[in-house]
């Protein structure tokens, strides 16, 4: 890879995310990174509610991270003395905030996966790991909380291999564990780092103690073998029995990490500031710069031509808006990642997703909750823009006047739970509308709907905690007092057999009439396949300009199914014939014909109700296992398997969301508070007939 002069600075850039299970110590790790990079003067403890990254009030109270804050920090490599810019995206570890993780994965080049050494790989860590796989993000793993009771570095390494199916490459080994955790051994450089003060700022570097020599030599051999597997030059040396140099080993591990074939594993205790500087060195050593990840691609309007945007400040502008936030002082902030080109304040950009030209106001580089104004953001940088009115999550921003291209967007999951919300007073009514609209702009997995007939407002989201926090923000940020109903399940509707319909809309009432006529074939698709519309009209029986309106009519009718009024999903609609009238046909008439046709097809197609099914994992002491399984079975659960972890059992099951309300309380009483569980949305499945009938009676 040849690097031009204008790209040189990018070799010293790292855009990383810190991703983990709730409570694995992710925010604390981020905090410590900011402390050691000189960005924070005093340390905030998450469990005391004062962390720098967790800056929304609810996050401080709950000690969990909700919104991914983007922060710019600087690090001087301990060994080489070279300076690096590290942009950190702090991602939430709670499953209800998966969209935040998805968004950050889109804009990262690498990630640090943080694990709790006493717990190994937990369910949410698995979800985050899979998301990183999907977006092709290279990772290093950090076995945190090595000072905690029950901490085991080997547990984390084995879990990465067994539960995640990845190849761990431990580049460190802990000296001691739990209360005796006193340092780490760097296997690459064969040095022991002993922590000599509480802040972890003083480190004594020396030789590997004799009692660890056998273990560390064996691990170094395994590390060289793993690196040789991904680097041919090293493989030749290895086969000839030669020892690689330190530089060769680092280069090979770097190559394997960037290719996502191996995952370096480090250890430490962020809370006690142990191992964080070495983690920063590893971020620099093994995670890619913006030049080492595949260039982002943009698709042109024809849907086929693809343009690559290499990371170069002198190239054409290509940026992705990955988060919208309402800021009390400056208004709407649009967080962007610049992939190519340079964004300057005061310039105009073209929002290709919305087909709008927008003016860039001021540009900010963000620290956890302070900011620095800049005149430009260059390729590889992350920052926030003030002044963009229309940009939303996942929108593509390109140069004003450039050809319209769309960068690959962000997968937005559909909400699975909804509840009714109403303002307490007349004065709250208007504020509630504004507040909900702003919150929905920030969070695309949060949907707001108003029933046309009853005027009832419902909000939908990814889980109970998600909606609880949004209602809480409505109260704090928009001063709206609201009553909320009990949570309801977001059902869907579909058809179970293929049908054909002939739908004609004709109206004659003096003067020009209305005429639209379409023949539709509607067929069921696999669960989760979404919606496909196909035009199979031949010979112009329906002119091209009426196909779009007919499709629009179909899509509008899909918003409300015949059984419970929930959206219709997983169908393919083919328009294969129809007719038109030279004078009376209009876009409106075809839209109505399309809409009527779909409604008729769903009625005829043996409609069914679909319900969200959650993947549930319960960790319980052995003696309560029977009760836990019995309870899950009584909730229409399907047990997927069990696995022993220490002296506890992990029960995995698929359970319909409608059966999981109030589960936390029931489970606590059945296990005397000793079990814990996590649940994530997994898939939609058909509701059994007897239950579907009950739902329709309600």
UniProtKB/Swiss-Prot annotation:
Matching CDD domains: EF-G, EFG_III, EFG_mtEFG1_IV, EFG_mtEFG_C, EFG_mtEFG_II
Keywords on record: Cytoplasm, Elongation factor, GTP-binding, Nucleotide-binding, Protein biosynthesis
InterPro entries noted in UniProt: EFG_II (IPR041095), EFG_III (IPR009022), EFG_III/V (IPR035647), EFG_IV (IPR047872), EFG_V (IPR035649), EFG_V-like (IPR000640), EFTu-like_2 (IPR004161), G_TR_CS (IPR031157)
Protein residues bound to GTP: 20-27, 90-94, 144-147
GO BP term, example: ribosome disassembly
Location in or out of the cell: Cytoplasm
Domain tr-type G: 11-291
Assigned GO CC terms: cytoplasm
Pfam families with a match to the protein in the record: EFG_C, EFG_III, EFG_IV, GTP_EFTU, GTP_EFTU_D2
Superkingdom, taxonomy of origin: Bacteria
A GO MF term: translation elongation factor activity
Protein family (similarity comment): Belongs to the TRAFAC class translation factor GTPase superfamily. Classic translation factor GTPase family. EF-G/EF-2 subfamily.
Function statement: Catalyzes the GTP-dependent ribosomal translocation step during translation elongation. During this step, the ribosome changes from the pre-translocational (PRE) to the post-translocational (POST) state as the newly formed A-site-bound peptidyl-tRNA and P-site-bound deacylated tRNA move to the P and E sites, respectively. Catalyzes the coordinated movement of the two tRNA molecules, the mRNA and conformational changes in the ribosome.
Protein name as catalogued: Elongation factor G
Source species: Deinococcus radiodurans (strain ATCC 13939 / DSM 20539 / JCM 16871 / CCUG 27074 / LMG 4051 / NBRC 15346 / NCIMB 9279 / VKM B-1422 / R1)
Name of the encoding gene: fusA
């Amino acid at each position: 890879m040849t690097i031009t002069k204008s790209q040189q600075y990018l070799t010293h850039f790292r855009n990383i995310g810190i991703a983990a299970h709730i409570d694995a110590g992710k925010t604390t790790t981020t905090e410590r990174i900011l402390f050691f990079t000189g960005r924070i003067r005093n340390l905030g403890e998450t469990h005391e509610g004062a962390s720098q990254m967790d800056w929304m009030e609810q996050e401080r109270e709950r000690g969990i991270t909700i919104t991914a804050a983007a922060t710019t920090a600087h690090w001087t490599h301990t060994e080489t003395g070279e300076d690096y810019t590290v942009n950190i995206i702090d991602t939430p570890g709670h499953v209800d905030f998966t969209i935040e993780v998805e968004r950050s994965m889109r804009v990262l080049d690498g990630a640090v996966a943080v694990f709790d050494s006493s717990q190994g790989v937990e369910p949410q860590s698995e979800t985050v790991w899979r998301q990183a796989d999907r977006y092709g993000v290279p990772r290093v793993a950090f076995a945190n909380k090595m000072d905690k009771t029950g901490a085991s570095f080997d547990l984390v390494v084995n879990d990465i291999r067994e539960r995640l199916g990845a190849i761990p490459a431990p580049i460190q080994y802990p000296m001691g564990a739990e209360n005796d955790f006193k340092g780490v051994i760097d296997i690459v450089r064969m040095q022991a780092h002993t922590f000599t003060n509480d802040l972890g700022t003083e480190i004594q570097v020396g030789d590997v103690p004799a009692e660890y020599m056998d273990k560390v030599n064996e691990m170094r051999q395994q590390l060289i073998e793993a690196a040789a597997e991904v680097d041919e030059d090293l493989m030749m040396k290895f086969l000839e029995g030669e020892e690689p140099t330190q530089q060769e080993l680092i280069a090979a591990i770097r190559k394997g990490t960037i290719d996502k074939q191996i995952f370096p594993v480090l250890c430490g205790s962020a809370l006690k500031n142990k191992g964080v500087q070495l983690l920063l060195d590893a971020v620099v050593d093994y995670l890619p710069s913006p030049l080492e990840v595949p260039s982002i691609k943009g698709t042109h309007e024809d849907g086929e031509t693809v343009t690559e945007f290499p990371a170069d400040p002198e190239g054409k502008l290509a940026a992705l808006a990955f988060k919208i936030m309402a800021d009390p002082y400056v208004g709407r902030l649009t967080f962007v990642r610049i992939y190519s080109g340079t964004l300057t304040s005061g310039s105009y950009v073209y929002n290709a997703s919305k087909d709008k030209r927008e003016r860039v106001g001021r540009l900010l580089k963000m620290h956890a909750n302070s900011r620095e104004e800049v005149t430009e953001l260059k390729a590889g940088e992350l920052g926030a823009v003030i002044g963009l009115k229309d940009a939303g999550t996942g929108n593509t921003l390109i140069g004003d006047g450039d050809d319209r291209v769309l960068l690959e967007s962000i997968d937005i999951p559909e909400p699975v739970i909804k509840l009714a919300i109403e303002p307490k007073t007349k004065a709250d009514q208007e504020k509630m509308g504004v507040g909900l609209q702003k919150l929905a702009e920030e969070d695309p997995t949060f949907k707001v709907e108003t029933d046309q007939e009853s005027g009832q407002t419902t909000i939908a989201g990814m889980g109970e905690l998600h909606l609880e926090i949004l209602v809480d923000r409505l109260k704090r940020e928009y001063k709206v007092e609201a009553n909320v109903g009990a949570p309801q399940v977001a059902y869907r509707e579909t058809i179970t057999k293929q049908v054909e319909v002939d739908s004609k809309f004709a109206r004659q009432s003096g003067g020009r009439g209305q005429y639209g006529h379409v023949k539709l074939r509607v067929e069921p698709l696999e669960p989760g396949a979404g919606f496909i519309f196909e035009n199979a009209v031949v010979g112009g029986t329906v002119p091209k300009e009426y196909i779009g309106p007919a499709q629009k009519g179909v899509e509008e009718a899909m918003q409300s199914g015949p059984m419970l009024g929930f959206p219709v999903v997983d169908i393919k609609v083919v328009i294969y014939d129809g007719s038109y009238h030279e004078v009376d046909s209009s876009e409106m008439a075809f839209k109505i014909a399309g809409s009527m046709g779909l409604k008729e097809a769903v009625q005829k197609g043996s409609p069914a109700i679909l319900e969200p099914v959650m993947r549930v994992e319960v960790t319980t002491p052995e003696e309560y296992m029977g009760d836990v399984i019995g309870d899950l079975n009584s909730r229409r659960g399907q047990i997927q398997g069990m696995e022993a972890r220490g002296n506890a059992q992990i029960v995995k099951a698929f359970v319909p969301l409608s059966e999981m309300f109030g589960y936390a309380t029931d489970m606590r009483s059945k296990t005397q508070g000793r079990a814990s569980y996590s649940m994530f949305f997994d898939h939609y499945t058909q509701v059994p007939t007897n239950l579907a009938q009950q739902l329709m009676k309600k």
